Amino acid sequence: LISGNNTGTGILQNIMDSNGTGIICESEADTVSTAIGTEYGNWSDTLRKAFDHDRLSYNRRTDREYQEVSRSYLSVLLSGTPAQVKPLIPTAENGLFSRQNFYYMPRVTQWADQFGEDEVDVDEEFRLMGNEWKNTLDELTLRGLFTLKLTHAQHKQFNFLFDKLFHRSGKINGDEMSSSVIRLAVNACRMMSIVAILRSLEDPSLVKPDAHISSDNLKDRIIPRWNLVITDDDFHAVLALVEPLYLHATHVLSFLSSSVIKRRSTADKNMLFAEMEDEFIRRLLLEKAHDRRIPESTALT
């Protein structure tokens, strides 16, 4: 667990010390942006490489020590206000923006009762869940490598969805969202892997030994590689997240500076065009915009 109140170099060193793994979890995004200060380059480079599990290296000049990890596994969870996004991701052009998943929370519009009837010890509940997950993770680690295998039909549905989204993003936002769509596909596959592995704990039939495991190893139950499938229900549940995540990303994009295009689309406009056919007339567009309470000028520009 790596502190966000850190420097870019410090974060890199912490990852090295834990053999390439780490989690950063902060409730205030400016804790990180203030701490890294002038070392933004180190922070950005580390996050971009960690997204693809790339090699990380570090050269300590004081004692001429060189450190390296061949694979990196870093998870980052931050919350904050729109104003706290820009210091962390000043622009969409260096690749850091497209590597993130965003969720823009709606404003609280009414008071909610702050008093509960139960007497649940929340800290204890989280400890129990943490211990349960650790035991599960230890068991999965001992079993070896799991590889997610999609069916041919799932391949077609996945490609159909992202092909349409990629085409639409190019028409509405130019090249700014192209990388985000591509990496959203990567993140969707990662979410499918997690959902599938959790489902396999309930239904062991979703996991089969890899076809290249020798018969002798199968007899001795020495199986280091497993093929994992995802149910159609779980597959479609994850795919249903793609469009909302794309819209949240386009909304956050509007907070960032741009030197590429003068006018960006909004999430509302993206959603409007997502509901239109590939070809449509002006009247139908304005009718749909009226239904969504989107100004005519917004729909037409």
What are the residue ranges of the model-derived segments?
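Phosphate-handling catalytic cores of nucleic-acid transaction enzymes
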Residues: 1-301
